[in-house]
């Protein structure tokens, strides 16, 4: 659009310049013929000469004013182009500094079984079993039951306190999210000197990686350093629904995070009074949905769009400067021709 306007302005200027040149040449020829016809002794009328001079002066003034307006318009366009260049560069730098967070979801049929690390302390694992959709009623709460879960005990040094030993019970978590697989565990704590009873647990992304690791103690130290620990209280059934979030870091590494939704239901203890001194813990782990959330930072700044805008702005600056230069030259040329015509008219009168 800018090129079309500039080409049109160039054509108008060239046509006006040719018209002015033709008019001046025709006027020169008419003056010469008039002088030849009147003879050397005849002087043209002062009034006619003054009138023609004033008309030519008015036309020249109008053309000069029009040229000045054109120059001002194109100077304004140059200022807009400069502002556009500055704004484009500023926006591009801001987009580079502040990337936008992109969140996507990937559906899976089954998860890689997570690892659940329990820190029961003096509590004892009574039962551990995988169920689907529903949990059957408790047959004998507080008594040892079935253990069809894959478990392993491991002792390692606390990653932050070198003189503290951690004793963890690692349990394989659920996999079949479409079948609503869940893991139900029951613990019993016979005696406790504490005012509040709770068991800590930790979730990490892959039980298989733990089993294949040659340094399981170091693996658990790294997990405890990277993941947060949670608690579930005695006397309740805590239902934990897990969801997986993968975040892509700036250096290309992928960090895994578990998000949990917990619901707590009070356990109605119907055991004999002699057995109620032992505290019971119930916990259920289940996947919330079959969608893995992926989070990454993306840069919305497109370098090709920025380059195209800059090229267009610089082209507009160049064309505007060229047109302004041509307009100034045209004004100077018109001014010289006007002064020349005025001098010739003065000579004729004298």
Curated annotation (Swiss-Prot):
Q: Where in the cell is it found?
A: Cell membrane
Its primary localisation, in coarse terms, equals: membrane
Q: Does the keyword S-adenosyl-L-methionine apply?
A: no
Reactions performed catalytically: chloride(in) = chloride(out)
Q: Which residues carry this modification: Phosphoserine?
A: 9, 14, 24
InterPro entries in the record: TMEM206 (IPR029366)
A GO molecular-function term, please?
A: pH-gated chloride channel activity
Q: Which residues are glycosylated?
A: 155, 162
* Superkingdom: Eukaryota
What does the entry list under GO cellular component? chloride channel complex; plasma membrane
Per its database record, what is this protein's job? Chloride channel gated by pH that facilitates the entry of chloride ions into cells upon exposure to extracellular acidic pH. Involved in acidosis-induced cell death by mediating chloride influx and subsequent cell swelling.
Hey, which family's this protein in? Belongs to the proton-activated chloride channel family.
What is this protein called in UniProt?
Answer: Proton-activated chloride channel
Gene name, per UniProt, is Pacc1
